[in-house]
Amino acid sequence: MTVKALTQISSAGRNGVGAFVLQCKKLDIHYSDWAGSSRGMNGFIKSLLPKFAAANPQIEFVVSPRPAKHPILMGHYINGRTKAICVRNMEPLEILKKAELLRDASGEKPQKFKKPVTSTNPSVRGVWSPYHGQGMAV
C-alpha cells in the first residue's frame, strides 16, 4: 500500500466537523520605507502587528519591503487562493481591520445568490400570488 500526500488540509464545506481549521495560512505584508502612502503601514508594523501576530500563532506572517510601491496585505488560504488588499494612505487601525478581514475570510470566490434564502427543499405552501384565493373586494 502506497502513501499519498494530502492535496488540501481541509475544505471550507466540511469545516467544523471534528475541529475548526482557520482557512488563512499565511499573511504577506508589503510596505515601503520611502513612500508616503506606507506611513500607516509602518505604524501598523511597529505597534499593532506584534500583538496581532501573538494572538494568531496559526498564521505565518511575512513582512517584506517593496520600495516605491503602495503597501498591500496578501492572504494565502489552504484552498490555494490568494486575496490582496491595497492599504495605501490608511491608518494603522484601518489596516488592522483589513488584516482581520483577511484572517476571517474563507478564501473562496464571492458567489452571487439568485434568491436571498437558499434551500434544498421547496416551500410547502408554495409561492404567494395575489391572483390565487379569494382576492380583494373593491
Swiss-Prot record:
Keywords, ordered alphabetically: Mitochondrion, Ribonucleoprotein, Ribosomal protein
One Gene Ontology term of the molecular function aspect: structural constituent of ribosome
Localisation per UniProt entry: Mitochondrion
GO biological process: mitochondrial translation
Coiled-coil positions: none
PANTHER family registered for this protein in UniProt: 39S RIBOSOMAL PROTEIN L43 (PTHR21396), LARGE RIBOSOMAL SUBUNIT PROTEIN ML43 (PTHR21396:SF2)
Annotated protein name in UniProt: Large ribosomal subunit protein mL43
Organism of this sequence: Neurospora crassa (strain ATCC 24698 / 74-OR23-1A / CBS 708.71 / DSM 1257 / FGSC 987)
Lineage of the species this protein comes from: Eukaryota, Fungi, Dikarya, Ascomycota, Pezizomycotina
Gene from which the chain derives: mrpl51
